[in-house]
Structures are given as structure tokens and as C-alpha cells.
């Protein structure tokens, strides 16, 4: 059958408009294709975990490979079956070998700057010490980041054009990496600029680690560094009332302490000032967590997407290991956005994956995408036969 040329042009224009509308969801132009769906920039670490035993009495530890930025890439690869990469430092000694093996096992493509260990004092892959706590006893976290290789990373260390040569859809970094040194924040900005040139969406996790920032300037320095990074971000995550945006981009309000940790109005009040200051930001999302005890949390999430606020359901969590729950939320939320879910459903996927992640030992996921979708739809803990 002959189709008139004018009709062909009209059909072509309609298809192009449909593609444009699909790509322009959330106020963002998310690339539909790329060799890498997601690339994160950050430090790789190993976490020593004695479980419920405090370190002063511990006789054995599990070893978890982690990194706030890496965890998102690992979760997206392992649970959500996406093509991801991590840009980081690696050291040629047994701890580096252990970490590199776990990165490969999670299905994440590595882009490393290699450092040579001198056999005595480094450079090193950082060690995080974190017990799980129990009941009324809170978890305790401390670090050995002496002569850390990742803290020595600087602009010019990576060939971004090569890393992004096959196309990249999403680039991510975070406040933990920004806190390591003067040059890591500069490298984040360099990576963000290169990612934007490659057409990628850029996100930043506002996670705030007071112990890390106190080494070189404290809260005032954190404000300066994170504010400089935020102006390049399309998406911000991690602004819960425990830290994040509340300490990273604004002066804490006394009203925060007067309201429930699950009250989304706290989030909404902060959003107005942030998006006015950073009009480049189109999406902001965070978990809402009320800690009743180490093992019992109330869990929710909230997102602001292109001018509209969305709130997740709330559930009660029995916590096995809380480390990585926020990264679990972020990665599930990113997955929803990358796959074109509507904002409410993307938020539920993040909420569900973050909740499930707290039921596993370690910092990265053991969930399947089917489990996440089932829980997001209101699934229960009934046995599946």
C-alpha cells in the first residue's frame, strides 16, 4: 500500500515527538542507550564487621567490600541487571586484590588508577570498622584511612573520553568521596563536566560523614565543597534529617528536631531553598527513617521531581545490617528513573530495595529485581513456594 509522502513525514514527526517526550521525563534528557547505564566515581574500601560483638571483644570479622558511590553501581548491576562501571583507585597488594575480585563478582566494570604499595605503609585501600550494634546499643563506625590511595586522586588522573566513549547514561558521585581531600572534590567536578559533555545525567549523594570532614575544615569546609559540586548536579539524593543536605547545603533548622523523622514536610521546607539556589537540580530524593532501636526502624522515602513531591508508603523494618540502606534506596530509585517508571513508582522501587538491603549482611544487595518489584507492590514476608 502506498503511503503519501506528507503522511510519512507526519508519522515520523509524531514518532520523534513521542521519543522526545519519553526522554524528557522528570525534566531531564536521559539518554535511552549507552554502553554503560551508570558510572560511579568514588573510593573503594573494605569494611570489617564483627557482627553484634564490639571490636574491643571481637575475635573474628566478616569482610565487606564497599564504598558509598560504588554500592550504587554494584546494586544496579547485580540486582537490576544494568551495565555499570566504577572509577576509583586500586593498590597492587592483597587487600587490593580482594576488593578488585569483589568488584568483578558484582558485575561492575572497573576503571582504575593503579598505585604501587611499598610493603610497609601504603598507599592503602581504606579500612572501615563497623559493628552492627544490638537493641539499645548503637552501631559504632571508625576508620583507618591513613595514606589512602583514593584520597590522592586528582583531576587529570582519568581519560573521561575513553571511559564514556561507548556512551553513558548516568554519572554519580557522593559526599564521602568529596570529604577525602582537596583534590577529590575537584575530581568530582571534572567528572561531572565530562559526563555532561557526553550527554549523561549527573547525580550526587549528599551523605555527610562528620568524622571525615573534621580532619580538614569541618562543617564550614563541607558547605563550601558540596555547594560547589551541587551546581553541576541534575539529581541530589541523601538529604535525610540525620545529615546529608541538612548539613551539606543548609544550616540545620531547629524545626527539624521538633517533627517526626517520617514527616515529609521537613523535606519540603528544605527543598524550596535548595532548588531556588540550584535551578539546575530537577530531582531530589531521600529516605525517611525513625530509629526506635538498632534493630527496629520505621522506613519511608520522599522525592521532589520537577516541581512535584511524592511520598512512599511507610513500613517497619527489623534490621540485620543498616549499612548501605541509603545506597540501596538510591540505586532502586535510579533504576526506576533509568527505565522510565513514573516518579511515584520509581520512588517505591528505591524504598523497597533500600528496605530489603537492610535484611542482608554487608553493604551491597543480595535482592533480585523480582523481589524488589514484589515488595514495592505491597508484598509480604509470607513464604514463597
Question: In which residue ranges do the predicted regions lie?
Answer:
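Hydrophobic beta-strand scaffold residues
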Residues: 84, 110, 202-204, 237
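Conserved phosphate/ATP/ADP-binding segment of small-molecule kinases
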Residues: 211-306
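Conserved N-terminal subdomain of the carbohydrate kinase-like
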Residues: 83-175, 372-385
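Short pre-catalytic strand/loop immediately N-terminal to key active-site residues, enriched for Gly-Thr
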Residues: 57-66, 310-324
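Alpha-helix C-terminal capping segments
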Residues: 64, 71-83, 105, 336-339
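Conserved post-catalytic alpha-helical subdomain immediately downstream of the catalytic base
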Residues: 294, 313-379, 383-385
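Positively charged, low-complexity intrinsically disordered leader regions
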Residues: 22-55
